């Protein structure tokens, strides 16, 4: 069905001026007059893909914003669907047609599936997630909420909280500080309490948010949650956006349907509004109870986004500030570090006295495990965000979007490269019987000849949605079969030799967390209801051996299960571990 708003405005020819994004940091401090009336357009969850309905709707919205009396345009994230380089460049071009000052933060759709490891956003918008903007006596502090390169709850990086404190300390006298975060500051953030306490300590009383696609006031531990609606709206709802009018001590929230007059939905005091304080807050998560069962090895000032690898007593991992660290757990000190320009997402590999890591800034690197001296470096054309596997003196790993390769561990020489088209191969590949099996964010699971890189077969689940791709799965191989659980919430079994689909089962809602017993007889997977199930790998059809409720409730964090000495270890989205 044709959208009447698209048909009405489709023939409009817009000649619009380009305006670059606002700088990522506030400027010099000084006296400012008391906060004045500030009229803003608040766009969030616009979800633009070239050629989709939102693409047309957003062009109309930009024209309306340009014709309005708004002083400032604010974007609350989820500008795209998959966060691809193509989508980001396209939506940035549309945003640049605004003739008003504007700034944006990323949403989870820019950070969870980013093929560039979140580097394209920084390149286009001038910051990696933190942005400060001043307007008429207001200081807006925007920051990213993740999750980063995997399905998980949101989290504000420690370095971003430190940035918030520095920016707030530099606020001009009389300036009112407003927070902007794509995620609501509630139970959907793993460190929500730390975030709200930080904001309150620097005088923030209101936070703009999106993510939920609807206009609903919220109480973020005493901070007023000011919502923005999605551009497309719910089924049967007119497309539109949000207008926020700040009046020094209050904000008026208006809904603006495309082509129609705005409608006032709420008026909220910016401090201690009774209607906000009367709303319930999400309960705080229980305090950790691992006393006596857990030992802190190292506390990092940045967010750890990789898995851990051990070279004997040396722990190796990467963080969100691009530091690859080697930490001696016995002596309790750092041995060495190498800092890359962007965050690290690949779990390091320790083998043959080498530490190997891929970089979101591009390239695969090998370092001497003892000294940190670079041994070799293989350039790539795009970000490396996937995990690798070693076997027989070779490394198998994604070489950026659309390709995977085999690398000689000693020299760093590329032995073969297979180009499959597009999408990152993010999950760790599996190797058996001379066959390399991996998934990609292009809807397909691939099987290659490990010796030559020749394609033997590929499979997809029949869905046209990239969101259901097996891009972050770790295939498990046992008895000549391949077992996977992808975001389509189905357990799938394929024949390793031919790629023939043997069976699929959706009796339980499953996600990417899987494991395999040491003898290969049991395949483990975590359900979205917080259960751990085991199935018989030798059975001709799905045969469940047992299912244990972990007591976690709703669960979707993708973290491979770890099996050792007959015990399965599995982690949850709230930082809990079960065995």
Where are these regions (language model features)?
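N-terminal active-site segment of His-dependent metallophosphoesterases
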Residues: 5, 23-89
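Extended active-site neighborhood of metal-dependent phosphoesterases/phosphodiesterases
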Residues: 85-173, 194-206, 216-228, 234-247
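Extracytoplasmic beta-rich repeat domains
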Residues: 288-309, 336-349, 376-391, 400, ...
């Amino acid at each position: 069905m044709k959208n009447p708003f698209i048909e009405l405005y489709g023939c409009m020819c817009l000649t619009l001026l380009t305006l670059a994004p606002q700088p990522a940091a506030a400027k010099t401090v000084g006296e400012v007059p008391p906060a004045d009336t500030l009229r803003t357009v608040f766009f969030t969850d616009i979800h633009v893909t070239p050629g989709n309905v939102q693409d047309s709707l957003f062009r109309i919205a930009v024209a309306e914003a340009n014709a309005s009396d708004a002083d400032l345009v604010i974007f609350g994230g989820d500008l795209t669907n998959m966060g691809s380089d193509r989508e980001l460049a396209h939506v940035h071009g549309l945003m640049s047609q605004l003739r008003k000052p504007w700034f944006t933060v990323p949403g989870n759709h820019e950070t969870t599936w980013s093929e560039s490891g979140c580097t394209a956003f920084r390149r286009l918008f001038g910051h990696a997630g933190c942005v400060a903007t001043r307007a008429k006596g207001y200081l807006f502090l925007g920051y990213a909420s993740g999750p980063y390169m995997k399905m998980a709850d949101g989290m504000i990086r420690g370095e971003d909280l430190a940035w918030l404190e520095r920016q707030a300390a530099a606020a001009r006298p009389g300036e009112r500080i407003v927070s902007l975060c794509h995620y609501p500051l509630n139970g959907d953030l793993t460190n929500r309490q730390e975030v709200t306490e930080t904001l309150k300590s620097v005088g923030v009383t209101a936070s703009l948010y999106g993510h939920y696609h609807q206009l609903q006031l919220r109480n973020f531990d005493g901070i007023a949650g000011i919502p923005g609606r999605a551009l497309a709206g719910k089924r049967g709802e007119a497309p539109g956006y949000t207008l926020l009018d700040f009046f020094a001590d209050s904000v008026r929230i208006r809904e603006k349907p495309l082509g129609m007059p705005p409608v006032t939905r709420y008026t909220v005091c910016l401090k201690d509004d009774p209607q906000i304080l009367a709303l319930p807050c999400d309960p705080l998560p229980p305090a950790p109870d691992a006393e006596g069962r857990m030992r802190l090895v190292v506390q990092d000032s940045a967010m750890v986004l990789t898995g851990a690898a051990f070279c004997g007593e040396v722990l190796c991992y990467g963080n969100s500030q691009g530091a690859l660290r080697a930490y001696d757990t016995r002596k309790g000190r750092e041995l060495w570090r190498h800092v890359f320009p962007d965050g690290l997402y690949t779990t390091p590999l320790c083998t043959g006295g080498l530490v190997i890591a891929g970089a979101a800034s591009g390239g695969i690197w090998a370092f001497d495990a003892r000294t940190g001296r670079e041994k070799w470096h293989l350039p790539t054309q795009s970000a490396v965000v996937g995990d690798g596997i070693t076997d027989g003196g070779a490394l198998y790993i994604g070489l950026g979007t659309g390709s995977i390769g085999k690398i000689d561990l000693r020299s760093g020489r590329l032995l073969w490269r297979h180009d499959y088209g597009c999408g990152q191969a993010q999950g760790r590949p599996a190797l058996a019987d001379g066959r390399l099996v991996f998934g990609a964010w292009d809807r397909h699971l691939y099987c290659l000849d490990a010796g030559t890189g020749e394609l033997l077969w590929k499979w997809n689940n029949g869905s046209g949605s990239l969101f259901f791709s097996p891009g972050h799965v770790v295939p498990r191989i046992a008895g000549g079969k391949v077992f996977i659980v992808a975001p389509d919430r189905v357990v799938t079994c394929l024949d390793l030799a031919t790629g023939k689909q043997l069976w699929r089962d959706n009796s339980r809602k499953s996600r990417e967390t899987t494991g395999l017993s040491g003898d290969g007889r049991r395949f483990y997977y975590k359900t979205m209801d917080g259960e751990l199930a085991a199935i018989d790998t030798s059975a001709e059809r799905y045969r469940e051996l047992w299912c244990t409720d972990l007591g976690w409730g709703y669960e979707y964090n993708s973290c491979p299960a770890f099996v050792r000495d007959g015990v399965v270890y599995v982690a949850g989205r709230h930082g809990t571990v079960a065995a």
